[in-house]
């Protein structure tokens, strides 16, 4: 019998890869921050395994536009899931169902040499479940 291989996003011991310690964040408007809110390129898939080969480097022909922040279910992708009643998928910890809606977001951001002379932190709020980030093709 073939053993099912657990995927990275099924490992409950992984709470972050390459991320800073969690802490309270207080914000103020400053020239030292860039908002990434706005239109992003978006590709919806039924499962992460369906991600196109090299998607982090390839173009976005055939991708859609989606506003960030938003919830893709409210933009016509997938359906809303209300877990206060009943899960819509079989629960078999630690395995994630093979049909696992996935969104790939892309945005081009240009930073000046002056900006890059300082530490730069990429901060995401409200990401649901697991996610990966590539910057200039680097994981």
Residue positions per predicted region:
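Mature N-terminal segment immediately following signal peptide/propeptide cleavage
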Residues: 32-43
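N-terminal glycine-rich cofactor-binding segment
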Residues: 82-94
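Generic detection of short hydrophobic beta-strand segments and adjacent strand-loop junctions
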Residues: 34, 66, 107-109
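Active-site-proximal helix/loop capping residues that flank conserved catalytic or ligand/cofactor
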Residues: 38, 61-62, 107
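Short Gly/aromatic-enriched secondary-structure transition segments
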Residues: 50-68
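Accessory beta-strand-rich segments of carbohydrate-active enzymes
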Residues: 2-14, 18-22, 26-27, 41-45, ...
């Amino acid at each position: 019998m073939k053993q099912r291989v657990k995927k990275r996003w099924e490992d409950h011991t992984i709470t972050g890869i390459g991320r800073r310690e969690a802490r309270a964040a207080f914000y103020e408007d400053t020239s030292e921050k860039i908002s990434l809110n706005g239109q992003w390129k978006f590709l919806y898939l039924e499962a992460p395994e369906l991600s196109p080969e090299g998607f982090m480097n390839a173009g976005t022909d055939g991708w859609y536009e989606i506003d960030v922040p938003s919830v893709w279910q409210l933009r016509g992708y997938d359906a809303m899931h209300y877990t206060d009643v009943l899960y819509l998928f079989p629960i078999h910890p630690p395995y994630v169902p093979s049909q696992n809606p996935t969104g790939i977001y892309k945005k081009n951001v240009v930073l000046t040499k002056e900006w890059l002379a300082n530490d730069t932190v990429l901060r995401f709020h409200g990401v649901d479940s697991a996610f990966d980030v590539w910057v200039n093709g680097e994981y």
